[in-house]
């Protein structure tokens, strides 16, 4: 201490040597000024008029706030002429001690008086002081008058303007900076991007800034790229954000969090989760913010399995006590309906903040627990936490979910009392409350009372009218937005587009699309995905694809929406192709894409690829999602994998109707009709509710098995559950009775349909046609036209088939020619087949050949097969060989062609040619499908093959068959035996093995069934001439009705005649 006293004494002496002045100043610099000397009394005396010492002491006392005003006054009062160093330290003192704005202005005045305003260092200090005190005008004035500005000065000014959301000024300053040849650096772009994030900036401006960043070589700067990722993500350009992220060679925590958060917010949740996993695998420790973003993604895709895995990682890494992470977990569990886990986390939290309560209240509100949300709100009060706008908005949301309008009105009054009435969130929640409670008048009144500049409220009104399917008012609101110059955001256009989708208004949707293009929102991932969804659902798949390729980039939602569109319209091959292209571009599918890809595999019965997608879903964590499980049930059941179908079915939630329907439908479509019916019976036994889809599949299964008894049982359940008035179900029943051989029941069912549509008429017309009642089919067609029901392609198939079966060639040709002229229908291949069949049945083979050669489309195999079959009947070898030649070009391995050609040679007695044809079949490994017939006796299905001797009653059946044949021969039956004799001659086999299966089935039926029961037989091939003749005579000698359903139609035999009138 003595050294300081000595120094003071020297300063108080009247005659101090010059060298002591320099010594004392140096001493102060070295040792500093002790606190005891820092007093109001010592300071003025010590300073005297010595400028150098004053400046030196200023360095040490600048941290003492009590000296700020005193020392500045000393400068003015004592007439000291401070130098630039003194003023610099005084300014630093003002900054360190938070001096008043007036003090700084005094110093600024001194600087101007002394002409030191050109001093760059002083200008920087003054500039910093004004910025520190928030005097933007003073800072800008100093900035403009600076002789030279460093890059740091520019950056400070830009950041200050950005913090005040003065976007125009930021860009103006940036342009000025570049024009003055100042090279921007990381800090510059950071400030500019901050300004962009704070306001609405046109996309092309952001692109220009990005281009400048690349030009300056800052593509690897996290300082610049992290906010750029966030900016792109915030505005929905997640693909561009990902491009910036992928371009960073060294990514920091903020880079990962920005990208994960951006993906999560832009409905790329699956990609966000995968990116989080990549980050963890690379050894980068997740931050609470990273956990929050990825948990938010899990919440959006509703994946409890992934959420629980992340919860485990939270515990493992020691984040279980982090309030930020716990809040995200509570929100996740509440959203997924796991209230126990959410409340457990809440109760174990060491610290709960307002966000915690808000999260819990919001979770309860979203789950529909309005009462619990209100109780928690009261507890929040008891814990001394005040509600904020988020709390009150969540409580209003709870009222919206519960539909409790009265409580919502009370909250409305409460928010007004607390001064939150003009809060944007609460305004949106209240408006949504009135809209969802269908109080559209109050909603509109409230909307008009609010600050209509808030785009969120406009969006709510768009959604409100959309919920009412009021497209006119929805569009009116949209037009009013444009008049009021309300700038749309990424949710505005999707709101009205979704209404267009629901109402099927493509024209208005296209108008909205044009507005989207004008405002450059087509690059927004969310808008792009909704546009694709609209065009896909409304049938313009090519337009949807064009948008996907041009604008979607790597947005997984857009790609999976496109896949779903193809699946909806049964373009399963395109759906799978798109799915593969998505994977090839490095886009990992979400649960929507995987589900629709599996559905496409089911439609194509592509089992192997479906199993690969199943494995991919297991790896991705989506295999337990209910829609995916239902798609798996459909895949395996349609592919005939019964065991795998039930395994997938057992993984679904109990009682899920979609899974049950998938099982019934899948088995039915794969031909496992008995299994489909067993599942249907089990459904009813377990009390599972049926619907149109269930009954439709069950009825079709009964149709395919031609099991009249089971069909009637299904019909009984339909009647019991009240679905017998549903037109779709009734239509299926008409077809079922027709396929089971009961045309009378089909007629009865048709008459009971209250609202007949084109499917109803088609069902009865085709039923009459298949059963050989051509006149009735044509009468029904006339009634259909008179009922103002427009026919379609299916109708005309039934009409032309009816004309064919009853030999009305000219009338049939007239119907065919009227398809385009009267009904606007272009003939399809099946219509050409009907005409060829019509001509050939009438023996007009040459005319049929000419008709085929003049077809505007290439004849398919069925056309040529129809002609060849007729040539066998009419023994026309020339045209038959011509047809066979074309048929073998199309289907060289088809056994039916060789069989028909062999039969043609046989009926033409060209035995060598016949044998050569059969030899070719053997060489090519082509095998003829064996004939098989079925008949139901005493609730059991009995199956017979040609010459079958395996039945337990084979001897009795063959013996009875011989008796029937003898009796038929006595009244005129003559066996077509030349082919049989040739078989016997060449193959030297027992004649019994050439008895066709339908003859054995009929013999067994007549032997076993009561005399009053019709004989119902099914056959997999077409009935031959000999069998047809034999059955006609047997129906007469047995006095029984015999119904045979072959591969082409029904034959009703009774009294020695057939309903087909020998045209089959």
Swiss-Prot record:
PPR repeats lie at residues 83-118, 119-149, 150-184, 185-220, 221-251, 252-286, 287-321, 322-352, 353-387, 388-422, 423-453, 454-488, 489-523, 524-554, 555-589, 590-624, 625-655, 656-690, 691-725, 726-756, 757-791, 792-827, 828-858. GO terms for biological process: RNA modification. Gene3D superfamilies: Tetratricopeptide repeat domain. It comes from the Eukaryota. Residues 939-969 are annotated as: Type E(+) motif. One of its GO terms (molecular function) is zinc ion binding. Pfam families: DYW_deaminase, E_motif, Eplus_motif, PPR, PPR_2, PPR_3. Residues 863-938 are annotated as: Type E motif. InterPro entries: DYW_dom, E_motif, Eplus_motif, Pentatricopeptide_rpt, PPR_At4g14850-like_plant, TPR-like_helical_dom_sf. Residues 970-1064 are annotated as: Type DYW motif. Keywords: Repeat. NCBIfam families: PPR. Belongs to the PPR family. PCMP-H subfamily. This is Pentatricopeptide repeat-containing protein At4g13650. It comes from Arabidopsis thaliana.
């Amino acid at each position: 201490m003595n050294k300081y006293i000595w120094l003071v004494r020297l300063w108080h002496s009247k005659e101090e040597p010059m060298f002591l002045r320099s010594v004392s100043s140096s001493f102060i610099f070295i040792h500093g000024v002790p606190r005891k000397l820092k007093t109001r009394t010592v300071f003025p005396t010590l300073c005297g008029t010595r400028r150098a010492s004053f400046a030196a002491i200023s360095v040490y006392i600048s941290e003492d706030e009590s000296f700020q005003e005193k020392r500045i006054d000393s400068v003015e009062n004592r007439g000291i002429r401070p130098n630039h160093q003194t003023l610099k330290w005084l300014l630093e003192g003002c900054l360190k001690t938070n001096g008043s704005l007036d003090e700084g202005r005094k110093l600024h005045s001194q600087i101007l008086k002394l002409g030191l305003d050109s001093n760059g260092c002083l200008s920087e200090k003054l500039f910093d002081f004004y910025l520190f005190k928030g005097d933007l005008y003073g800072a800008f004035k100093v900035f403009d008058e600076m002789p030279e500005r460093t890059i740091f000065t520019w950056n400070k000014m830009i950041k200050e303007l950005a913090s005040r959301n003065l976007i125009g000024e930021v860009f103006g300053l940036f342009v000025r900076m570049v024009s003055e040849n100042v090279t921007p650096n990381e800090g510059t772009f950071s400030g500019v991007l901050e300004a962009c994030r704070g306001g609405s900036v046109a996309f092309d401006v952001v692109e220009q800034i990005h281009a400048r960043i690349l030009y300056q070589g800052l593509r690897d700067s996290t300082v610049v790229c992290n906010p750029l990722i966030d900016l792109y993500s915030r505005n929905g350009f997640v693909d561009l954000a990902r491009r910036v992220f992928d371009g960073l060679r060294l990514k920091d925590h903020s880079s990962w969090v920005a990208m994960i958060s951006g993906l999560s917010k832009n409905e790329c949740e699956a990609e966000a989760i995968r990116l989080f996993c990549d980050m963890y695998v690379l050894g980068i420790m997740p931050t609470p913010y990273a956990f929050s973003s990825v948990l938010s993604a899990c919440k959006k895709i509703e994946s409890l399995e992934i959420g629980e895995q992340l919860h485990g990682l939270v515990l493992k890494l020691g984040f279980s006590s982090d309030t930020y992470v716990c809040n995200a977990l509570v929100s996740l569990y509440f959203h997924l309906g796991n209230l126990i886990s959410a409340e457990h986390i809440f109760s174990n939290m060491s610290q709960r903040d307002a966000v915690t309560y808000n999260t819990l209240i919001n979770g309860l509100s979203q789950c529909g627990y309005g009462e619990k949300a209100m109780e928690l709100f009261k507890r929040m009060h008891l814990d001394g936490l005040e509600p904020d706008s988020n709390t009150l908005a969540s409580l209003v949301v709870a009222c919206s979910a519960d539909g409790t309008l009265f409580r919502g009105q009370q909250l409305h009054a409460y928010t007004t009392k607390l001064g939150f009435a003009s809060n944007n969130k609460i305004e949106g929640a209240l408006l949504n409350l009135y809209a969802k409670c269908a109080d559209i008048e109050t909603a509109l009144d409230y909307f008009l009372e609010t600050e209509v500049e808030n785009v969120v409220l406009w969006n709510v009104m768009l959604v409100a009218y959309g919920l009412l399917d009021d497209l006119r008012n929805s569009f009116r609101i949209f037009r009013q937005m444009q008049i009021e110059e309300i700038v749309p955001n990424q949710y505005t256009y999707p709101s009205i587009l979704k209404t267009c989708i629901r109402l099927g208004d493509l024209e208005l949707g296209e108008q909205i699309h044009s507005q989207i293009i004008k405002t450059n929102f087509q690059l927004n991932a969310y808008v792009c995905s909704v546009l694709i969804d609209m065009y896909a659902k409304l049938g313009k798949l090519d337009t949807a694809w064009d948008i996907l390729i041009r604008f979607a980039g790597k947005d997984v939602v857009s790609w999976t929406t496109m896949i779903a569109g193809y699946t909806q319209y049964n373009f399963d091959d395109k759906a799978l192709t798109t799915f593969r292209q998505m994977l090839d571009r490095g886009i990992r599918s979400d649960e929507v894409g995987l589900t629709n890809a599996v559905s496409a595999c089911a439609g194509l019965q592509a089992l192997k690829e479906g199993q690969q997608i199943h494995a991919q879903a297991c790896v991705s964590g989506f295999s337990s999602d209910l829609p995916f499980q239902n798609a798996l049930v459909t895949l395996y059941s349609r592919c005939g994998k019964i065991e795998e179908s039930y395994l997938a079915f057992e993984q679904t939630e109990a009682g899920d109707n979609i899974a049950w329907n998938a099982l019934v439908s899948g088995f039915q479509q794969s031909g496992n009709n008995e299994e489909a019916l067993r599942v249907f019976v089990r459904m009813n036994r377990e009390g599972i509710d049926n619907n149109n889809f269930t009954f439709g599949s069950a009825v079709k299964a009964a149709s395919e098995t031609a099991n009249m008894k089971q069909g009637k049982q299904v019909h009984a359940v339909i009647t019991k559950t009240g679905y017998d008035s549903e037109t779709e179900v009734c239509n299926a029943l008409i077809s079922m009775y027709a396929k089971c051989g009961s045309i009378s029941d089909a007629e009865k069912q048709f008459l009971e349909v209250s609202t007949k549509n084109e499917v109803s008429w088609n069902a009865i017309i085709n039923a009459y046609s298949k059963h050989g009642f051509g006149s009735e089919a044509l009468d029904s067609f006339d009634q259909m036209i008179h009922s103002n029901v427009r026919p379609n392609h299916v109708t005309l198939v039934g009409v032309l088939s009816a004309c064919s079966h009853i030999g009305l060639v000219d009338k049939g040709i007239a119907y065919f020619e009227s398809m385009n002229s009267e009904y606007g229908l272009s003939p399809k291949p099946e219509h050409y087949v009907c005409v060829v069949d019509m001509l050939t049945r009438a023996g007009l083979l040459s005319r049929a050949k000419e008709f085929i050669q003049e077809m505007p489309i290439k004849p398919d195999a069925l056309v040529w097969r129809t002609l060849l079959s007729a040539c066998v009947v009419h023994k026309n070898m020339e045209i038959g060989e011509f047809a066979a030649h074309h048929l073998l070009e199309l289907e060289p391995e088809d056994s039916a062609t060789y069989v028909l050609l062999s039969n043609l040679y046989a009926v033409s007695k060209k035995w060598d040619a016949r044998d050569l044809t059969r030899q070719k079949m053997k060489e090519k490994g082509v095998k003829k499908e064996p004939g098989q017939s079925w008949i139901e006796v005493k609730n059991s299905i009995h199956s017979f093959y040609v010459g079958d001797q395996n039945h337990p009653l084979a001897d009795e059946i063959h013996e009875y068959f011989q008796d029937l044949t003898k009796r038929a021969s006595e009244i005129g039956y003559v066996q077509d035996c030349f082919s049989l004799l040739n078989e016997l001659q060449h193959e030297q086999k027992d004649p019994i093995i050439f008895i066709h299966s339908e003859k054995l089935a009929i013999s067994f039926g007549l032997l076993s069934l009561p005399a009053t029961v019709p004989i119902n037989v099914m056959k997999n091939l077409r009935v031959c001439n000999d069998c047809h003749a034999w059955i006609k005579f047997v129906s007469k000698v047995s006095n029984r009705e015999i119904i045979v359903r072959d591969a082409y139609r029904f034959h009703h035999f009774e009294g020695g005649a057939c309903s087909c009138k020998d045209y089959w």
